[in-house]
Each structure stands twice: as C-alpha cells, then as structure tokens.
C-alpha cells in the first residue's frame, strides 16, 4: 500500500493528513494558528509559527498510526492563498510577519492603481481585479514600509513567497525556491496567459524580479524534505492553493465541472479548460492546478459570509447554543415564512461587488419566530452560491460551453442536509457530496501521487472519487426562479438601507 502525506496549511490551523492510495484518510493531526491583529483591518501570522506547527503536525500524523517517513511515497502541499512572506535567503528568517489574505492595509495602493487606469491591463494579464486581497500590493507594502527591506531586496538578499513557497524553502533547507501556477496566479504579478512573472506588472509595483520564486506545474518535483526533519527524505511532488486543490480533490478535471466549498465563506470554482475566459459577470479568472505544462483555467467567485452567518446566530443573536443546532431549528418550520436574510455584514462579493451593502432581514411579521430567521440564515448561503453559479453558467454559455450539469460540494456546512437540498432546489441540478470530505488535502495528495507514479492519469483519479450522497432538485424551475427573483429584490434593498 502506498501512502501520501498532505500538508494543509490554512488560515486558522495547520493540518497534516495521510492518505492511502485509494484516497482514504489514514491519519490526521491539527494545530491551531494564532491570529495577529496589529491594527483594525490588519491581519498577520508568524511565519515561524506556521513552519513549526506544520512540521509538528506532520510528525504527529505519522506517529499516530505507526508510519515512518520511508513509508510515504510523496508529499503534497496546499495552503491559504495570497498570504505574503518575505525572508532572508541566507538565514531563512522572515523580515516581518506574514501579511494574511484578509489584510486590507494595501487598499490605498489599490485605489491609486485604479485611479491611474491600470485595472484593464491587470485584469487582461492576471484575470484578477485590483484588490488588496492579492499578494502584489502586500509585497509592495513590505518593501516600502519595513526599514531596510527594499535595499536588501535590490541586493538580491531576500526571497518572496506565498505560504507554499515558505514551507518548501524550510522543508528543503533553502535549496528550493518555488511555487506552483495556482498560487502564482493569486499574486496580481503573474501573467496567466504566458505562465510567467510579468515584467511590466513587477515594474508597475516596484518589485525586484530577484525576489520571485520559480513557477512550476502543480504536479511536479519540488525537491526533497531534509532527512533530519521527519527521519527520511520525502519527495515533494504536488503543490496547489487551497481552492484549486479542492477543485482537483473533487475530480473536477474537465471544463464545465465545478465545486463549492462551504466554510466561513463560500468558494466556488468552475474548470474552464485550456481557454482563458474573462468573466462578464464579476468573477475572477484564475489558474487551475496543472499536471503538465499545459495551461488550465477556472472561474472563481467568493461569498464573504457563508457559514459565518450561523456563527452570528450563535454569538450575535444568541439564537442557538451551538452551530450544530441550526439545522434542527430551521427544520422545525416548513419554510422561512417569507423572511429573507442578506448577510452583507462586510459588503457583498461576487457577482455583486457591493462593498457598501449592509446586512438586512426583510419580510418580518408578528408570526415570525427565531426558527424562521434561522431558516432564512441557512437559505442565504444557498442563495448567494446560486447567484454565483448562475453567473458562471452565463459566462460558460457566452463562451460556447454547456451550462453546469452538477455541483460537487465540500466544507463544514456541506454536512447540513437541509442546506444542500435547498441548494439543489435553487440550481435545478444535482448537488453531490463526496465520501471523502477532506478534498483540499486530497487534491494535494493526488497531485503528489501523479508526479511520483502512484497514479498514472487523472482518469484513474476520477475512478477513485466517490459520492456519499446526491441531492436532487424537488422544486419546479418556475418556483426556483421566483425565489431567486425575491432574493435579488432583497439584495437591492441592502444598498438602499
């Protein structure tokens, strides 16, 4: 039996998962990651804490089932995207805390870029909109605001990377400075059409090219783990950003296949194949995980408040004691009783892009109970995801492709049967929950397995993917359209409020 080790470095925790060659979870270890908030709107992580925690979980996962490093055929890495690290090449020490993807300190730089008319250029090259979310302006902030850093960078003494690059550097003892296309595509510095760092964009942001890691396919050889770290050298064979890794772990290998990850927010990606497809509906174009030098793309949209609305019911309204109670409370009523909740607590993301929107609850009557509000809260997750998916389908049809035939789902909230059934009802297509829900880590393991010869092709991986449950739509298309029209009316009210 071949085993694969996936390092899954996320925003709130570092995890290591061992899979067997059938894609089953053999061992899992997790360590929480402290969050650092120096100022309002700023979010940081300690890169050394990330490294120490990730290494500790790898050791713990192996030890928990009596495996040794020589039992592992290959390692895959998946990571929180956009989070930015800058470190000294000689010492391997970071020059500053990592600036996390949620951090908004670079908004003024983004505003300047928009005012200077650079949005069309950046979108054409990167597939992204100008936003502080992405790594490029975070890196510029470090160069401009940390004493002595720009001079060191211009002397070639520093290295930049997203979290995957940082872990690869540490795992290989500083012998490999690399990233994969999916992570590179989230920096706002990478030309997704040419698969190269873009000299014009680097110059625009004043970033020395010497900082940048080598870009490889997602399934490739990234060096070997130093033997003294885990007891034996392990080849690093797969790397992908978390959402692209989840798309791969859901076996969405062909154009037109899509997955939605239901977490604190929701992340929806649809594979679009080898064609760069610019969205006309407020979505981002991003690189999908690549198993060869052939470029692969995906459309991506994010819902800012997904499962977080359940946390708000618990912590803000004190409507429930624990998040697990929400499904039973929502099921105690047949529907939301006309109540519609739009949880625009931090504005609305794709496809609306309305940062000024604020949350609303409409349709309240004397007969409204907390159960109706709980149901409306759950349904809001499905409405937002449906709006995203309908936008993706419009883009697909405009490009001559077929509309989406099914949606594969993962993430914590995908275990909620009521939510998944309502999602299928709104979309009018099957919603499929996989047997293995650790799809992000599984994607990294599969990428490593391909490059190390455990698997021969993505067709072989497709045969390993298994559904746990399929939710079929029960509403007529007319009724689903009525509900979506009511949702869109409620969304318009969030901007008027």
Curated annotation (Swiss-Prot):
CDD domains: FGGY_EcGK_like. Its EC number is 2.7.1.30. Gene3D superfamilies: 3.30.420.40. Keywords: ATP-binding, Glycerol metabolism, Kinase, Nucleotide-binding, Transferase. It catalyses: glycerol + ATP = sn-glycerol 3-phosphate + ADP + H(+). Pathway: Polyol metabolism; glycerol degradation via glycerol kinase pathway; sn-glycerol 3-phosphate from glycerol: step 1/1. Glycerol binds at residues 81-82, 133, 242-243. Inhibited by fructose 1,6-bisphosphate (FBP). Sn-glycerol 3-phosphate binds at residues 11, 81-82, 133, 242. InterPro entries: ATPase_NBD, Carb_kinase_FGGY, Carb_kinase_FGGY_CS, FGGY_C, FGGY_N, Glycerol_kin. GO terms for biological process: glycerol catabolic process; glycerol metabolic process; glycerol-3-phosphate metabolic process. ADP binds at residues 11, 15, 264, 307, 412, 416. PROSITE patterns: FGGY_KINASES_1 (PS00933), FGGY_KINASES_2 (PS00445). It comes from the Bacteria. GO terms for cellular component: cytosol. ATP binds at residues 11-13, 264, 307, 311, 412. GO terms for molecular function: ATP binding; glycerol kinase activity. Belongs to the FGGY kinase family. Key enzyme in the regulation of glycerol uptake and metabolism. Catalyzes the phosphorylation of glycerol to yield sn-glycerol 3-phosphate. HAMAP family: Glycerol_kin. NCBIfam families: glycerol_kin (TIGR01311), PRK00047.1 (NF000756). This is Glycerol kinase. It comes from Polaromonas naphthalenivorans (strain CJ2). The lineage of its organism: Bacteria, Pseudomonadati, Pseudomonadota, Betaproteobacteria, Burkholderiales.
């Amino acid at each position: 039996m071949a085993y694969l080790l996936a390092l899954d470095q996320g925003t709130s925790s570092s995890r290591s998962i061992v899979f067997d060659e059938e894609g089953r979870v053999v061992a899992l270890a997790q360590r929480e990651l402290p969050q650092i908030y120096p100022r309002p709107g700023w979010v940081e992580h300690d890169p050394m804490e990330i490294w120490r925690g990730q290494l500790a979980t790898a050791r713990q996962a192996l030890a928990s089932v009596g495996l040794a490093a020589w039992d592992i055929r290959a390692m895959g890495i998946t990571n929180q995207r956009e989070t930015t690290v800058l470190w000294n090449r000689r010492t391997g020490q970071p020059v500053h805390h990592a600036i996390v993807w949620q951090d908004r300190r670079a908004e003024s730089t983004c505003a300047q870029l928009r005012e200077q008319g650079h949005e069309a250029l950046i979108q054409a090259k990167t597939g992204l909109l100008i936003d502080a979310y992405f790594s490029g302006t975070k890196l510029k902030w470090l160069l401009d605001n940390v004493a002595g850093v720009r001079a060191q960078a211009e002397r070639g003494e520093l290295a930049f990377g997203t979290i995957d690059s940082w872990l690869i550097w540490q795992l290989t003892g500083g012998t490999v400075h690399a990233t994969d296309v999916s992570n590179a595509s989230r920096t706002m510095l990478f030309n997704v059409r040419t698969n190269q760092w873009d000299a014009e964009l680097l110059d625009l942001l004043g970033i020395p090219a010497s900082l940048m890691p080598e870009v490889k396919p997602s399934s490739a050889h990234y060096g070997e783990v130093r033997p003294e770290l885990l007891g034996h050298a392990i080849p690093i064979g797969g790397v992908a950003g978390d959402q692209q890794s989840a798309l791969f772990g859901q076996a969405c290998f062909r154009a037109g296949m899509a997955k939605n990850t239901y977490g604190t927010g929701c992340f929806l990606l649809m594979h679009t194949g080898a064609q760069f497809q610019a969205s006309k509906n407020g979505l981002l174009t991003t690189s999908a995980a690549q198993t060869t030098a052939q470029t692969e793309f995906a459309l991506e949209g994010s819902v800012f408040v997904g499962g977080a609305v359940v946390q708000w019911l618990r912590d803000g309204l004190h409507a429930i004691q624990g998040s697990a109670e929400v499904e039973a409370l929502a099921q105690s009523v047949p529907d939301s009783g006309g109540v519609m909740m739009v949880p625009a607590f931090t504005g609305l993301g794709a496809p609306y892009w309305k940062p000024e929107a604020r949350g609303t609850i409409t349709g309240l009557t004397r007969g409204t109970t907390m159960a109706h509000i709980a149901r409306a809260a759950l349904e809001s997750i499905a409405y937002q995801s449906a709006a995203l998916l309908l936008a993706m389908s419009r883009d697909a049809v405009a490009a001559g492709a077929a509309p989406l035939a099914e949606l594969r789902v993962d993430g914590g909230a995908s275990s909620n049967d009521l939510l998944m059934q309502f999602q299928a009802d709104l979309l009018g297509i099957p919603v499929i929950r996989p047997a293995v829900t650790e799809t992000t880590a599984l994607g990294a393991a599969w990428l490593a397995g391909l490059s190390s010869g455990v698997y021969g092709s993505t067709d072989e991986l497709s045969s390993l993917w298994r559904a746990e449950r399929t939710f079929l739509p029960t509403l007529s298309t007319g009724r689903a359209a009525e509900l979506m029209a009511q949702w869109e009316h409620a969304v318009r009210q969030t901007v008027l409020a």
